[in-house]
Structure formats: C-alpha cells, structure tokens
C-alpha cells in the first residue's frame, strides 16, 4: 500500500486511516482511497472516522471534507495545514477557511510539484502562509508546530 511505501522513506509512522485510529504526535495518517476522512473527539483523544458519503467536488476522499472535519475537534489556531502536489482544486476552499480562522498554512511550490493544481489553487485565493519546495515542508511543519 501507499502507507507501507511511505514507511520505508519517512521516519514517522505512516498509517492508512481506519475507524477509531487515534491521531497522535509522531504519526502520519493518510486517507483511505475510497472514503472521506473525518474525526471525532473521544475524551482527550481524536480518532479517525471513515465515511462513504457522497463525493465532494467529485472526490472521495476529499481534502475539503477532511480540513473542515478537523476544526470540529481541534481549534484552528492549533493546526498546521499542508497542501501538496495534486490535480484540481480540492481542499482550496477549506484551506482558505482554515487560514481565515488562524491555521498556519503551507503549500508545495510549483517547481517541486508534479501537478500545481491543488497547491496553485490555494496560492491563487491567498490562503498560503508559506510556499516551499517539498524538501523544506517537513522542517517548516515542525517549526510551526512548536
């Protein structure tokens, strides 16, 4: 799976989202290929919830759905949102809402993007705090999370 391949090149643990999986420090969670990724609070924990609801902007999973869902369980000011290479504009409108609510936003630059669609859409609507090459994004995320 994609998560298994990422585990061979990334230091943090990479898991594909599953119902009830806890979101925690040091863990990278990627959306399942056929379900929206949403979240629920379980006491002090935040857990993944998979949804097979209708596609949003023709996408399932949808970045817009995921970004909107996280603010229901975590204050926007405590989040760092990142948009990497991708086709289309999925996630841009939700990233703008996050940005307007105080979330720090990071976007992959055009030079290092295979497809500039999704990150370019975020830049075009003025929702990017940082536009960086792929190899600089992890360090920026760690700095912003402090």
Regions found by a protein language model. Give the residues of each.
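Conserved acid/base catalytic micro-environments in cytosolic active-site loops
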Residues: 1-146
């Amino acid at each position: 799976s994609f998560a298994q391949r990422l585990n061979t090149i990334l230091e943090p643990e990479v898991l594909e989202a599953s119902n009830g999986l806890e979101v925690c420090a040091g863990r990278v969670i990627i959306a399942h290929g056929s379900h929206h990724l949403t979240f629920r609070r379980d006491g002090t924990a935040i857990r993944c919830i998979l949804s097979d609801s209708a596609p949003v902007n023709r996408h399932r999973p949808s970045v817009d759905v995921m970004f909107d869902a996280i603010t229901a369980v975590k204050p926007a000011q405590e989040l760092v949102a990142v948009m990497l290479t991708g086709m289309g504009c999925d996630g841009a409108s939700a990233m703008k809402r996050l940005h307007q609510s105080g979330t720090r936003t990071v976007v992959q630059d055009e030079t290092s993007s295979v497809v500039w669609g999704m990150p370019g859409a975020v830049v075009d609507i003025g929702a990017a705090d940082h536009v960086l090459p792929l190899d600089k994004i992890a360090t920026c995320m760690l700095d912003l999370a402090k």
